[in-house]
Amino acid sequence: MVTSENRAPRGRNFLRKWARRPIRVMVSVGAALAAWQFAAPREANAETIEAALARAYENNPQLNAQRAIVRQTDESVPQALSGYRPMLTANASAGDQYTTEKEIFPPIPGTALTQGAAVKINGHTQPYSYGATASQTLFNGNQTGNKVRAAESQVSAARETLRVMEESVLLAAATIYMDMSRDAANLEVQRNNVRVLDRTLTDTNNRFAAGQVTDTDVAQSEAQLAAGQASLHAAEAQLAITQANYRRIVGVDPANLAPASSVERFAPSTLNSAIAMGTAQNPSVTAAEYGVDVALLQVKIAEGALYPTLTAQASVQQQYGANIVTPKLFTDSATVNLTVPLYQGGGEYASIRANKEAVGQQQINVDQVRDQARANVVEAWAQLQAAKAQIEAAQRQNAAAERALNGVRNEAQVGQRTTQDVLIAEQALVNARQSLIVAQHDRVVSSYSLLSAVGRLSAQDLALPVKVYEPSVHYQQVRDAWVGVRTPSGQ
């Protein structure tokens, strides 16, 4: 603690300097906040929120992994289509064969073989053969057609799930961008606050040396400065945490972030229209609806097991050295097979019942997801309206806190206010600055949340400077592929 021995009075010069200080303090803190205002002009080399969202859209590992899942799901369609196509097989065999044959001849009257005869024949052959078989399913209870439609619905559901992930990543990127701006602005406010409190302590020491205040006033100033320093350290730690999360989500370290603005212009203008859009277009809802389609088709696929199966088969076979008597043999065949299931243990009936229950579960899930989407819209809408009102209130709070601090400082010079009053007024101004920073942060974040809730938070809707990923490109590349093990990307 500073003692009275090293406190030098400043007399009239000190009093004149004290009277002028509130203006400089307010300008310093106000300028720091103004530099962060969302309406401030952007620097030429500043990183914009659109650029950050574009980086996350291209590089986020969760989003890229979900795209790979969609490509994997695309392959279920050609797998299902394979049921329409013929199956071709080729076979070949070769071996070494030793045979012993005993031929018995019946008696022939009037010849030397009146008693009959038995002849033993030993043989050695090396038989080999080759052939081919083609089969085609003609009817299987429409299981193939339903499998194709189910696979197509699964692809559609996977695409909607990709939209869910895209919205999640873009919302996370927008939120961390605003968190970074908020925490950087808060750190600057805390730094200015410490500088102000440090000067306040110096002035209080000088007034104490002049006999104008007591040691209690000095202790109050010291306590407030220590509290300000603690808040500064906490703000520094929070900024470091936010920087790490920014890199995790966006893919690069944050640097020179430009001010951001609300995107509510892309959202519906009324709550009712937002609810209608969210319950119809939110990708979580549409993905659940495709889930119902898949479940219904699974019922039809299971019912197909009760129908007859009709297949056609053709084969050719060439054999050499099958035996001594027939050194060469060629066979060909064409058959049509009809299989009618009569009773298969009851498993197919259980499968049908289970799939019908799955339909009910999926329908309930749609209702649940739609209710959640509605709640998300209402929540985001309320948060956006609250943030807009909070900005107006915080702006009035800042103006009033500035006037109050000016008045308290001036009144303190004539003994009408104590040091504690000055410290309280300074803290009130800091709180007002923080309230405005948080309100501006919340308005931007809640506007992105509203877009996500109504299903409009996408790179295409935001017109981000990035090439939009189009899942249909890969789908068309593999849908009708009959052969080939390499993926369209070359893997």
Description of each model-found segment:
Residues 82, 248-251, 304-305:
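Solvent-exposed polar/charged
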Residues 65-80, 165, 169-189, 199, ...:
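Amphipathic alpha-helical coiled-coil segments
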Residues 2-7, 12-13, 17, 166-279, ...:
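Periplasmic alpha-helical coiled-coil/stalk elements that build and connect Gram-negative outer-membrane
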Residues 48, 87-165, 286-369, 376, ...:
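Small/polar-residue-enriched beta-strand and adjacent coil segments characteristic
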Residues 3-11, 96-98, 438-491:
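Acidic, low-complexity, intrinsically disordered peripheral segments
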Residues 17-32:
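Sec-dependent N-terminal signal peptides
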